[in-house]
């Protein structure tokens, strides 16, 4: 990355955008651009969408070094443009000049566009008051936990691997029971060595507030994202944002008023918090016949944190106090940014002092959702007392914290404690709730669509030769190393196209005390393949352990995974080296794609 001065990703605009945006003066050579098929004319080469590509700017003197780095990682690299001082974007196809535009003209975006916007009046009501159906407190708590925006999506979430890359600091669900939802994504930075620096990312958006007022909706989207980050133990002060916008089709002044007011609301938060944003994906096509999407400006915020300072949201210890660090909106329902900054800084200080051990940023389900979900993870008894009229209201910016000490702060309201007891009971205003019943209610709505359990599979067919009474005893393999003793075993990890857990596997081996050797199997040219096979054979000959890591390769389907790796293993030189490894008592380990290749 020290060689790269600037970069851009390829997308819908193809070469014209990905390269054209990089600098003022450019000479672009369209005939050099790699294509999937021949016969494209100049226009098609210039504007065709192309994914999975990056454009980078380097100094001319670094060209050979850059190409060498790319080739060593099996990455295709092509010199397709030169930076000039002409202030013009020129495109050539062979010897022909096909485009010659001044940067001044490009930056003007062509003809100027104007649109008239009218910001509509909002309804005269408090948008934070939320009515939850139910005759009793129990009914309301149950209905709140089954709200589509509050109910558990654990079955859906567990369809995705949250551990790949070996960087996850907070799992999606925390606690001994793994049932308290985590509000942020915390990932250690990917590096070949070791680090405690992690990224922490959160989002914010409420379609009901945004429908009432896009201005307020955008402002509270930023507030919600910041609150979640603070509740995880990070500081909001260096957060950076990307806003994702989605609005109805723009047809009149009133429709134009919605993105205008949303952007103004977000901009106000940027200025008052001092937190910049870049634009994200945006669309003005959210209309189908007479159905419109709600005005959407979703805020995604990210910052860095020391992984050791991160706290998870589940309740931790009996006897701890529960405080609501309360945010009180201004008279016009906008966030009180000065109060929020003070609150967030106070919480961050208490987390760093190890006084606050868990926290939950209030969201769709209000305080009732927060205390229920915090109690799920460890099943600890807790008791709170709070005004039932405000229990379910939106309270964005407010954070419920578990503290080991008494908090002396004007906006810290003591509402309860984590109590002694083994009944797993949550008491709200004197009404007792069984925590496991609350969990069942919270997970029930989507359970049939996205189940979080699987029924055991029992085959009624007894395999031939077994009477179903005597247990089948498989011959146990002897997995001990039988070679000569070594002080530091060498583990060799070949990296094939598509391998994606090589870094995490290497760290695991180093932690276990092995010397790790890795080599990338390059296959861009025939010469690359021969060289990679020779290098792989040499490494197998010198290692004590061969590990085939997991991943994905484009040749996997149809007929299953691991075919590319299996073909390499069947090469005579590689096969002979593997047999020699086994003969000298060496060990082989395969995981995921690597294991499937061994089976094949």
Residue ranges and their predicted role:
Residues 1-51, 55-61, 285-311:
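Hydrophobic, small-residue-rich alpha-helical packing segments that form membrane-like cores
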Residues 15, 33-41, 84-87, 282-285, ...:
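Short acidic loop-to-helix transition motifs that present clustered carboxylates
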Residues 1, 17-19, 28-43, 182-194, ...:
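Structured alpha-helical segments in the cores of large, soluble enzyme domains
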Residues 1, 60-195, 202-210, 254-261, ...:
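Intein/HINT protein-splicing elements and their conserved insertion hotspots or analogous self-processing inserts
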Residues 428-591, 595-600:
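N-terminal beta1-alpha1 cap of cysteine-dependent amidohydrolase-like domains
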Residues 121, 215-282, 286:
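A glycine-rich phosphate/pyrophosphate-binding beta-strand-loop-alpha-helix module
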Residues 5-22, 178, 226-235, 314, ...:
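Conserved phosphate/anionic-ligand binding catalytic regions in large, soluble enzymes, centered on
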Residues 179, 208-224, 568-572:
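Glycine-rich anion/phosphate-binding loops
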